[in-house]
Amino acid sequence: MSQVILDLQLACEDNSGLPEESQFQTWLNAVIPQFQEESEVTIRVVDTAESHSLNLIYRGKDKPTNVLSFPFEVPPGMEMSLLGDLVICRQVVEKEAQEQGKPLEAHWAHMVVHGSLHLLGYDHIEDDEAEEMEALETEIMLALGYEDPYIAEKE
């Protein structure tokens, strides 16, 4: 049986109102076992300052972002189940959900799904890659009982 081990780190000044660990686990379980037997993922929920700093250091972007994905590269010849880390910025997720008129829980789920697909090697730089990744995200989100996260862009 496929298993995803979650290491959840809540690093916000105020951690109240965040999704429960079981919700993060459900969202990971909807994505990763399709691609990998056993995995370990760290999800770190942060405030804007940490997100901003990491986004500047690793992507050269001088602002906080919704989710950063840090895939773990296993050295050749070693077998490890560590898939990588997701860093999700609470304030950006909350602001985007409000601006886009999406339920907050659905947007959190989407950020976990989106980031997990990045950990698995998916990207959206090229149009064809973006199309494939968005189709997978939509399929997973619908299976979880949420709306298509890209519905507004398709209308």
From Swiss-Prot:
GO MF annotation, one: zinc ion binding
Source organism, top-level taxon: Bacteria
> Keywords for this entry?
Cytoplasm, Endonuclease, Hydrolase, Metal-binding, Nuclease, Ribosome biogenesis, rRNA processing, Zinc
A Pfam family this protein belongs to? YbeY
Question: Known EC number(s)?
Answer: 3.1.-.-
As cofactor, the record names: Zn(2+)
- Residues reported to bind Zn(2+): 114, 118, 124
Q: Under the cellular component aspect of Gene Ontology, which terms does the record hold? A: cytoplasm
Keyword check for Transcription: no
Listed InterPro entries: MetalPrtase_cat_dom_sf_prd, YbeY, YbeY_CS
Q: How is the cofactor bound?
A: Binds 1 zinc ion.
Localization in the cell: Cytoplasm
Q: Which GO terms describe its biological process?
A: rRNA processing
Protein role = Single strand-specific metallo-endoribonuclease involved in late-stage 70S ribosome quality control and in maturation of the 3' terminus of the 16S rRNA.
Which family is this protein grouped under? Belongs to the endoribonuclease YbeY family.
Concerning NCBIfam families, the annotation shows: rRNA maturation RNase YbeY (TIGR00043)
Q: What name does this protein carry? A: Endoribonuclease YbeY
Name its species.
Escherichia coli O17:K52:H18 (strain UMN026 / ExPEC)
